[in-house]
């Protein structure tokens, strides 16, 4: 049997991993500018953590969860999204306590799991960057969080990003709109897809989110949720729009956007970009003011977003964005003969401990093959170490581009490599 990775997963090899690390690093730096701290939650949770918060009728719970019973007969699921686990942690660890500074700002980076049909930018194990902000109902929190995502995309050089915005209002507004949508869709029930016929009974707002052609046609003239917002919800949404304009962040109103998770209220948003003529959602989120209370904590407003790393990296590649990844090596040691083996290890380790990237030959190859490796590694400096150099206690180091070279004692290499490097590279 040929052993291969499971369908819908990937091996991220070193060349690609460098791009991942860069994007993650830019995200961490950006979030720290906004006073966010990292949280790491388990990759698996009790099934109820996800099913009861995300929604029993959502596609995630009914079709996509990787759930199982463990050896203690506990119902467990691999996490399909990041918000519910973070909210569970917020409540379990009492981050709502008075002594904890509010708002509590958290970010996470990690694997999520959904049983979906694998396609470009969508895998069964995928990686998500997300943020959650707890404790502030102020619409400025909505805008700051949206602006943080926008800031991240600017730093990464992503082009043609459009903010799509909607409001789901308060629970009361949503209930009124739900009934209006049922009244509108029921006469055309037979024209809907099978999934949307089920959604009409269980969660009619999800019909608006359907990608099926017949459903899109049916909801074209559906009533707008914005017409059902109560006074408080209208004021919140107007404040969000005003502050986005104050920050020069353009947006479009999309009244058919509802998001695929049941816990949202008030502001919801998506960032969409164009790739090869197709629109792709690269970030999505919104406000969820009842979720902390649902998990047994005090009523606490929340706002957050998630973005898929695979999709983000695909956009970066398709838009021709070159990431400034350092690929050069500082020094390569070519080793000739068994008598130089031990000293080569000693020297390369001393150079690394001074903060330089270094590699040496371990395969006993001919000098030409070793120099070729130095070129492959893009080594700035190359040193050749043989038994005669070991006896003399010194060796020649050369600039691999200019071919300028200098003879240096082992003692200087082991204690003062910065000066040697500066002399050859300046």
UniProtKB/Swiss-Prot annotation:
Transmembrane segments: none
HAMAP family listed in its UniProt record: His_tRNA_synth
Localization (cell): Cytoplasm
InterPro entries found in the cross-reference section: aa-tRNA-synth_II, aa-tRNA-synth_II/BPL/LPL, Anticodon-bd, Anticodon-bd_dom_sf, His-tRNA-ligase, HisRS-like_core, HisRS/HisZ, HisRS_anticodon
Pfam families attached to this UniProt entry: HGTP_anticodon, tRNA-synt_His
Catalysed conversion reaction: tRNA(His) + L-histidine + ATP = L-histidyl-tRNA(His) + AMP + diphosphate + H(+)
Matches recorded under Gene3D superfamilies: Anticodon-binding domain, Bira Bifunctional Protein, Domain 2
GO BP of this protein: histidyl-tRNA aminoacylation
Enzymatic class: ligase
EC id: 6.1.1.21
Similarity comment: family membership: Belongs to the class-II aminoacyl-tRNA synthetase family.
Assembly and interaction partners: Homodimer.
Keyword Ligase tagged: yes
Protein name per UniProt: Histidine--tRNA ligase
Originating gene: hisS
GO molecular function: ATP binding; catalytic activity, acting on a protein; histidine-tRNA ligase activity; transferase activity
GO cellular component, as recorded: cytoplasm
Taxonomic lineage: Bacteria, Bacillati, Bacillota, Bacilli, Lactobacillales
Alphabetic keyword roster: Aminoacyl-tRNA synthetase, ATP-binding, Cytoplasm, Ligase, Nucleotide-binding, Protein biosynthesis
